[in-house]
Amino acid sequence: MNKLISIIIPCHNCSATIVDCWNSIKEQTIGLRSLEIILVDDASDDQNVTWNALSKIEASAPDSVIIIHLDENVRQGGARNAAFPYIHGKYFMFVDADDTIEPDSCEKLYYTAEAADADMVLFNCTYRDHNGNSIPRVIYKEHQTLDLSNDTIRRQTLLGNGLTYGCWDKLYRTEFYRSVGSFFPEHVIYEEPLFVYPLFFYATRIEILPEYLYNYYIHANSTVTEYALQHRGDHPAVQFLLLSWLKKHTDIFSKYYEEITFYIVWSAFIETLVFTKNDPESDTAYPFYEYIRSILIAEFPDYSKNHYIRSLGYAEIFAYLEQPIETQEALKNLRSLIKKANL
């Protein structure tokens, strides 16, 4: 039977959660026979506990499950990359090994994509914890069709207006993805924009489905936050990798230079400041932010003329791109502006 949707699941030491994840997939109303599940063991180091769990899943549904073992830990981005050659479904999606999807997720996504001939379908998720608490993440409030042959609409998607650039809240048409050929960076924890953002330059039709089809589990483990802060450099680094990819595609870089300038400057500089506002080293890390600033000024010397940036009204914040951030006091002042703006 031809597979309708391939589901890619990166796995690392996930024996405690993969069963719930698998149960949510095998109970899909579209039928397990219509699905292809690609489980990628990202060099788990738990004495084969994860590998054995994945092997049991494969043995229970050999016609629908593929397991792949990686000898080197490349983190989620690299594990997803490893799955791409194995995709046979007309569409594919990502699920993390500690998350679940709603029983009718695949059915709704498949028929929505088919009816609209969509390159991507975007949908909502629910944040959950293991105490039974849940909070819906409201991004999409109504069903919409984005016709990206309309260049004005495309430019809005490149600014992130009302969209996300995460990878697991989307369904992708496989043929479309392969025509673009974007990929995830390896060995980083903030990997998704390098894969997702390029797709918006080439998609012709995107469906927005305002339903909560994905359950994202929040873990009350402070080490997760600590680890993210230890790897604070991943956030701007991935944006600079994305910039390098975009510059090689001169057609889109030239045509959408204004949108790209806004996105990279905002994401690499402002978002990094926001994401690290609880960093215990926040007041002494000014060389890190000066490094980001110096790259942005070199790449976008005319950023201050960008009409998207000018229209935001954060002139005091963006003014810090014009001067070196060389003291602890300068960074403190910049952070106070970020807090004042409620960013």
Which residue ranges define each predicted feature?
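Membrane-interface aromatic/basic loop that binds lipid-linked glycans or pyrophosphate carriers
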Residues: 117-118, 277-343
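Short aromatic/hydrophobic "clamp" motif used to bind/position activated sugar donors
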Residues: 92
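Cell-envelope/extracellular polymer assembly enzymes that use nucleotide-activated donors
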Residues: 3-6, 24, 36, 194
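Acidic donor-binding segment of Leloir-type glycosyltransferases
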Residues: 22-69
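Donor-binding/catalytic cores of nucleotide-activated saccharide
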Residues: 97-207, 217-230
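A conserved hydrophobic helix/loop-capping motif in glycosyltransferases and polysaccharide synthases
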Residues: 5-17, 21, 28, 40-42
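Catalytic core of nucleotide-sugar-dependent glycosyltransferases
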Residues: 211-220, 226-253, 271-300
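Glycine-rich, basic loop-to-helix element that forms the pyrophosphate-binding segment
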Residues: 69-87
